[in-house]
C-alpha cells in the first residue's frame, strides 16, 4: 500500500491531532480486526490501518511522511504479524487489568483480569517428586517411605505471620488489593496495567510485628515423610497424586498436592513392554529336536514350559497371565519367551559320528572341511 494516503486510510485530516489519530485508529482496528470481521478484504484493510497508524502516531515518522511521502518511511511501516490477532501482534493481555479501551470493548469482561483477594484463603502449591524403584517392586507393588522438604503452616502464629496478640493491617498503598494500577501510553491509547504492590508484595496486608518463628511468612520449611503404597503394575514415567501433601496454603487455605513420578530400574532378566514381559531362554539342539519340558523364570516365579519336538530357532512361546498386573485389576499381561537354540562348539568323535549318521539317514551329505596349513604340517610331522 505504498501509494495509499495514510491520512485517508485513517479518515483524518492532515492536521489531525494525536488524539484524533488514536481515536480513529481504535475505531478502525475494531472494525477490521480479523478475529471479528471475516469479510473478504478485512484482514488487508486491518494491515493498512496498522501501517498508517504506525507512521502517523510517531512524530518523527509523521514529519518524514509529510515531507517525502511513503518513500520517507520506506521499510518502517507494517505491524509485524498484525493479521494474527492481538496475541500475534505481540501483546500479552495476561498482565492487564481494566483496559478501558479497545481490548475491553472488543472482548468484554473476558479481557479483564480477575482480581483475587489476597487476604482470602489460598490453596498451597503442588510439589513434584521423582521416585526410583526396582523393577520387581513395580511388578509386585510395595510400601515405602518418601521424605522431602515443604513449607508447612507455622504453628507459632497459625499462618498469619504475626506475633501473638497482634494482627496484620490493610496495606494503605493498594488498599488491600495487593496490586497497583499503572496507566501507560501505547499505540492503542492509554492502557491500564496492574502490577504487584511493592509495599505489601501482593499480600494486601502489612505485618508490623512479624512472628519470630517464621519471620512473617506464615510458613516454615520442614521435612515431611509419608508412606507411599506403590501399586502393583506401575509403569515407568507414570505419575500419581497424593492429596494434601504439597505446600501449605495461605491465610488458612488448604495444602497443595504431591505428584510422584515413578522411574523404574531395568532388569537383567526381563524386558517390559506395557503389560507384557519378554524373555529369552537357551535350549540345546537335542531339546529342540526331541522336545522337552523346561523351567523358565517369570516375574511371578518359576513356570514350566513345554518345548515340542522340532522347535525352530527364535520360536516364541506365550505364557498366559505371567505378565504385569493391570493397575485397575482385571488380571495380568502375558510373558513372551523366545527360545535360542545353542549349537555346541566342541563335540567328541562319537557325537560327531552319530551326527554324521543322522544326516546320512536323512538323505543328506556333509562335505568335510579342508584342513588348514598348520593342521597339514602337523599331520606330516607326525607321519599321518
UniProtKB/Swiss-Prot annotation:
Signal peptide: none annotated. It comes from the Bacteria. Zn(2+) 2 binds at residues 171, 174, 197, 200. Binds 2 Zn(2+) ions per monomer. CDD domains: DnaJ, DnaJ_C, DnaJ_zf. Zn(2+) 1 binds at residues 154, 157, 211, 214. InterPro entries: DnaJ, DnaJ_C, DnaJ_domain, DnaJ_domain_CS, HSP40/DnaJ_pept-bd, HSP_DnaJ_Cys-rich_dom, HSP_DnaJ_Cys-rich_dom_sf, J_dom_sf. Its main location: cytoplasm. CXXCXGXG motif repeats lie at residues 154-161, 171-178, 197-204, 211-218. One of its GO terms (biological process) is response to heat. Keywords: Chaperone, Cytoplasm, DNA replication, Metal-binding, Repeat, Stress response, Zinc, Zinc-finger. PANTHER family: CHAPERONE PROTEIN DNAJ (PTHR43096:SF48), DNAJ HOMOLOG 1, MITOCHONDRIAL-RELATED (PTHR43096). Belongs to the DnaJ family. The J domain is necessary and sufficient to stimulate DnaK ATPase activity. Zinc center 1 plays an important role in the autonomous, DnaK-independent chaperone activity of DnaJ. Zinc center 2 is essential for interaction with DnaK and for DnaJ activity. This is Chaperone protein DnaJ. The gene is dnaJ.
Amino acid at each position: 500500500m505504498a501509494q495509499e494516503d495514510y491520512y485517508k486510510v485513517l479518515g483524518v485530516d492532515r492536521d489531525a491531532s494525536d488524539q484524533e489519530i488514536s481515536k480513529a485508529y481504535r475505531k478502525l482496528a475494531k472494525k477490521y480486526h480479523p478475529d471479528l470481521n471475516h469479510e473478504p478484504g478485512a484482514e488487508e484493510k486491518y494491515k493498512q490501518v496498522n501501517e498508517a497508524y504506525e507512521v502517523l502516531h510517531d512524530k518523527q515518522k509523521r514529519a518524514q511522511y509529510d515531507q517525502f511521502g511513503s518513500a520517507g518511511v520506506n521499510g518502517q511501516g507494517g505491524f509485524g504479524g498484525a493479521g494474527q490477532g492481538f496475541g500475534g501482534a505481540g501483546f500479552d493481555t495476561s498482565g492487564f487489568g481494566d483496559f478501558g479501551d479497545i481490548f475491553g470493548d472488543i472482548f468484554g469482561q473476558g479481557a479483564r483480569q480477575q482480581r483475587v483477594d489476597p487476604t482470602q484463603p489460598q490453596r498451597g502449591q503442588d510439589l513434584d517428586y521423582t521416585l526410583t524403584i526396582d523393577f520387581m517392586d513395580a511388578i509386585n507393588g510395595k510400601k515405602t517411605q518418601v521424605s522431602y522438604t515443604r513449607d508447612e503452616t507455622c504453628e507459632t502464629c497459625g499462618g498469619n505471620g504475626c506475633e501473638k496478640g497482634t494482627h496484620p493491617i490493610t496495606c494503605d498503598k493498594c488498599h488491600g488489593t495487593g496490586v497497583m494500577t499503572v496507566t501507560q501510553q501505547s499505540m492503542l491509547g492509554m492502557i491500564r496495567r496492574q502490577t504487584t504492590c511493592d509495599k505489601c508484595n501482593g499480600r494486601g496486608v502489612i505485618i508490623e510485628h512479624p512472628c519470630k518463628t517464621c519471620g512473617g511468612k506464615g510458613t516454615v520449611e520442614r521435612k515431611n515423610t509419608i508412606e507411599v503404597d506403590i501399586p502393583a503394575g506401575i509403569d515407568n514415567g507414570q505419575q500419581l497424586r497424593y492429596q494434601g501433601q504439597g505446600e501449605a496454603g495461605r491465610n488458612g487455605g488448604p495444602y497443595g498436592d504431591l505428584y510422584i513420578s515413578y522411574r523404574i530400574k531395568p532388569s537383567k532378566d526381563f524386558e517390559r513392554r506395557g503389560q507384557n514381559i519378554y524373555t529369552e531362554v537357551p535350549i540345546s539342539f537335542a531339546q529342540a529336536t526331541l522336545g522337552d519340558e523346561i523351567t523358565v523364570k517369570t516375574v511371578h516365579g518359576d513356570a514350566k514350559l513345554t518345548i515340542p519336538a522340532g522347535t525352530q530357532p527364535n520360536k516364541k512361546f506365550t505364557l498366559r497371565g505371567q505378565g504385569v498386573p493391570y493397575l485397575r485389576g482385571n488380571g495380568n499381561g502375558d510373558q513372551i519367551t523366545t527360545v535360542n537354540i545353542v549349537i555346541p562348539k566342541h563335540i567328541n568323535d562319537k557325537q560327531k559320528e552319530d551326527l554324521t549318521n543322522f544326516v546320512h539317514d536323512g538323505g543328506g551329505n556333509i562335505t568335510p572341511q579342508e584342513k588348514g596349513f598348520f593342521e597339514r604340517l602337523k599331520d606330516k610331522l607326525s607321519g599321518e
